[in-house]
UniProtKB/Swiss-Prot annotation:
Gene: EIF5A3
Recorded superkingdom: Eukaryota
Species, as recorded: Solanum tuberosum (Potato)
Lineage of the organism: Eukaryota, Viridiplantae, Streptophyta, Embryophyta, Tracheophyta
Keyword Repeat attributed: no
The protein, known as: Eukaryotic translation initiation factor 5A-3
Annotated keywords: Hypusine, Initiation factor, Protein biosynthesis
Length: 160
C-alpha cells in the first residue's frame, strides 16, 4: 500500500467515444467523416485505382457541419477513418437572452440554457423574427464531438 494520493479528473461524459472507426472505402457521399479533427458531411468521394506502389485511395471532399468550411482528405481505401457520432434533437424555443443564448424546452420538460444563437445570418434572422412575432418555434440542434449548434428551425404555429 502506498501513501500517495490519487487524483482523478472528472469528465462530464460517460466515457462514450465521440467517434467510431469505419473503413475508408465504405464511406459514401452524404455520410460523415472526421477531417483535421472536425466533424464533416461528405459531399464528394472519388476512388483512385491501385498503383504500382500501394493501395487504392479515397479522396474525400467534405463540409464542416458546424462552420461550413470545405475540407479534403486522401486515405487508403483499406484504412479506417474516424466517423463522428452525429445526433439531431428538436427542442421548443422558450426564450432568447440578451447575451445571445437561447432557452430551450427538452422532451422531459427541463430547460437547456447553454446554447448560443446560430451564427448563420439567415437562420439567426428567422429565429429572432419568429420569436418576436410570438410564433411557437422548434429548433433542430445538431451535436457531434462535444459541439452543439442550432441548424434548422420549424414554425409550429402561433402561441395562444
Amino acid at each position: 500500500m502506498s501513501d500517495e494520493e490519487h487524483h482523478f479528473e472528472s469528465k462530464a461524459d460517460a466515457g462514450a467515444s465521440k467517434t467510431y472507426p469505419q473503413q475508408a472505402g465504405t464511406i459514401r457521399k452524404n455520410g460523415y467523416i472526421v477531417i483535421k479533427g472536425r466533424p464533416c458531411k461528405v459531399v464528394e468521394v472519388s476512388t483512385s485505382k491501385t498503383g504500382k506502389h500501394g493501395h487504392a485511395k479515397c479522396h474525400f471532399v467534405a463540409i464542416d457541419i458546424f462552420n461550413g468550411k470545405k475540407l479534403e482528405d486522401i486515405v487508403p481505401s483499406s484504412h479506417n477513418c474516424d466517423v463522428p457520432h452525429v445526433n439531431r434533437t428538436d427542442y421548443q424555443l422558450i426564450d432568447i437572452s440578451e447575451d445571445g443564448f437561447v432557452s430551450l424546452l427538452t422532451e422531459s420538460g427541463n430547460t437547456k440554457d447553454d446554447l448560443r444563437l446560430p451564427t448563420d445570418e439567415s437562420l439567426l434572422k428567422q429565429v429572432k423574427d419568429g420569436f418576436q412575432e410570438g410564433k411557437d418555434l422548434v429548433v433542430s440542434v445538431m451535436s457531434a464531438m462535444g459541439e452543439e449548434q442550432i441548424n434548422a428551425i420549424k414554425d409550429i404555429g402561433t402561441k395562444n
